[in-house]
Amino acid sequence: MADENLQPLFQIQRVYLKDLSLEQPNSPAIFLEQEQPTIEVAVDVGAQPLAEGIFESTVTITVTAKIADKIAFLVEGKQAGIFEIRNIPDEQLDPLLGIGCPNVIYPYLRANIADAITRAGFPPVHLSEINFEVFYQQRLEALAQQQADNSSGIVMADGSAARH
């Protein structure tokens, strides 16, 4: 019976839409434009502990559509999930929160973003799949580079690292 309490546990407690905003600063005139918009997508992932063995993981997507120099729409959504994670080795916890949890909640966010764009009167934007493992590795590399850049230990008044 004691062995059961030490079994690794990864369980979804809840998936929810934490934040969703839509801006159409140039409507209704933007609907008269014939040109196809350019689409920019930004992604961010976060996680935080809520209680012992309970974590919140978030994926934030910002979609900006522009026609010429005018913003057609800007949609930002943050999908979150609460996960119970127990008896996972420490070296596996960060990748689980940065890769596994986002893989679970991202499909919900994709659907919510597409729905908001369609309801705003625009053609749907279908967000592609995201390889969160590659995204996680890129974040680790950026963090390592940032730490290497700040290795002098001297921080300037503006928060930047001193350069030699």
Curated annotation (Swiss-Prot):
Where this protein primarily resides, as one coarse class? cytoplasm
Query: Mind telling me which GO cellular component terms the entry cites?
Result: cytoplasm
Q: Which domain of life is it from?
A: Bacteria
Q: State the compartments where it is located.
A: Cytoplasm
Any single GO molecular-function term of the entry would be:
unfolded protein binding
Similarity comment: family membership: Belongs to the SecB family.
Q: Which species is this UniProt entry from?
A: Janthinobacterium sp. (strain Marseille) (Minibacterium massiliensis)
**Protein name according to UniProt:** Protein-export protein SecB
Under Pfam families, the record lists: SecB
